[in-house]
């Protein structure tokens, strides 16, 4: 962080993108300004945005690869220049763009001799490769080479224990961090009581989203993080009332779930994804972050479970109920669900 004295003043609070460029397919840069801020506010905003940009933005990446009968990740495959470990590292670097949630399947199936690049990955329709020229492996002989891949949207850095999988499947340490770097600087303006600060924010991304998109998502995540405090204030509920409040279960479904499964005419809840419901993006994202992907996942939760989800509110609870009423038969809801 840098502090400098500069001349000039800004009369109204505003933000603006002062510079934007594409250095390469996997390196985008953006520079933003926010002013005027009172003394100390620029640090508050800068620190919060930097942490949210680096740790809260979701990204899509390859999390697992299956090679077939490969004894361990340090093995070599006849006709391929790279070892299995080198191929895994190359797959880890592939940058993907997608709004999908949950685990999706992809694959590579080519015949040598030839170079294998990211362009050779067969992806689901809504997943896009940012840089198709990223290298994966070099086939030096006329062999058939196939890999089954798993793709997941997540946030942060996820590691898995290394095991020798008998089926040739190996985990890839997932780096779901579209924002590569963030820097902010603070400039002081004015004199005396009119002194204020200007915040400059620099963002570098990997090309799966623009710096402006990253800034928007980080800001939205911060707002969602503080909404519970605002909601509590609007309700006028004291801490003591909240502490002693008993929360009844949203869905008393577990005891009756067996009967529903036995009913041949029942709805296959594990085949209904929440993507198919008309949920708001806010409610949808809350559920996805909690690994709730199907209607069965949702109905297996109590209200206490849902309210423990980050940014989940009572309004989301009502919205879910209204949505279920719209999509499921009323008699099924009355018989199987209760508040």
UniProtKB/Swiss-Prot annotation:
It holds the Pfam family RNA_pol_A_CTD. Residues 264-339 are annotated as: Alpha C-terminal domain (alpha-CTD). The N-terminal domain is essential for RNAP assembly and basal transcription, whereas the C-terminal domain is involved in interaction with transcriptional regulators and with upstream promoter elements. It catalyses: RNA(n) + a ribonucleoside 5'-triphosphate = RNA(n+1) + diphosphate. It comes from Eremopyrum distans. GO terms for cellular component: chloroplast; DNA-directed RNA polymerase complex; mitochondrion. DNA-dependent RNA polymerase catalyzes the transcription of DNA into RNA using the four ribonucleoside triphosphates as substrates. GO terms for molecular function: DNA binding; DNA-directed RNA polymerase activity; protein dimerization activity. In plastids the minimal PEP RNA polymerase catalytic core is composed of four subunits: alpha, beta, beta', and beta''. When a (nuclear-encoded) sigma factor is associated with the core the holoenzyme is formed, which can initiate transcription. It comes from the Eukaryota. Its main location: plastid. This is DNA-directed RNA polymerase subunit alpha. Belongs to the RNA polymerase alpha chain family. GO terms for biological process: DNA-templated transcription.
């Amino acid at each position: 962080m840098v502090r400098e004295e500069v001349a000039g003043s800004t009369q109204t609070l505003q933000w603006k993108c002062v510079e934007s460029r594409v250095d390469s397919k996997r390196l985008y840069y953006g520079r933003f300004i926010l002013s005027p801020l009172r003394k100390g506010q620029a640090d508050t905003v800068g620190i919060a945005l930097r942490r949210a940009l680096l740790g809260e933005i979701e990204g899509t990446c390859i999390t697992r690869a299956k090679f077939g009968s490969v004894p361990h990740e340090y093995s070599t495959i006849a006709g391929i220049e790279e070892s299995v470990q080198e191929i895994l590292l190359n797959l880890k670097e592939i940058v993907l763009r997608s709004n999908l949630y949950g685990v999706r399947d992809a694959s590579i199936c080519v015949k040598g001799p030839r170079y294998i690049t990211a362009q050779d990955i067969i992806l689901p329709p809504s997943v896009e490769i940012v840089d198709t020229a990223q290298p994966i492996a070099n086939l030096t002989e006329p062999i058939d080479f196939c890999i089954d891949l798993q793709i997941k949207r997540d946030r942060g850095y996820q590691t898995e224990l290394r095991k020798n999988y008998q089926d040739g499947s190996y985990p890839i340490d997932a780096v779901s961090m579209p924002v590569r770097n963030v820097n902010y600087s603070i400039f002081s303006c004015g004199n005396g009581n009119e002194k204020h600060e200007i915040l400059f924010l620099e963002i570098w991304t990997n090309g799966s989203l623009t710096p402006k998109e990253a800034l928007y998502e980080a800001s939205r995540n911060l707002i969602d993080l503080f909404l519970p405090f605002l909601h509590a204030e609007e309700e006028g509920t004291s801490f003591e009332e909240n502490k002693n409040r008993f929360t009844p279960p949203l869905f008393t479904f577990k005891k009756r779930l067996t009967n529903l499964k036995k009913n041949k005419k029942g709805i296959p809840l594990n085949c209904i994804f929440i993507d198919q419901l008309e949920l708001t993006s806010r409610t949808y994202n809350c559920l996805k972050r909690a690994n709730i992907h199907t209607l069965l996942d949702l109905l297996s939760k109590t209200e206490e479970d849902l309210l423990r989800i980050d940014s989940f509110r009572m309004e989301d609870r009502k919205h879910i109920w209204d949505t279920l009423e719209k999509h499921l038969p009323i008699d099924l809801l009355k018989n199987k669900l209760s508040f």
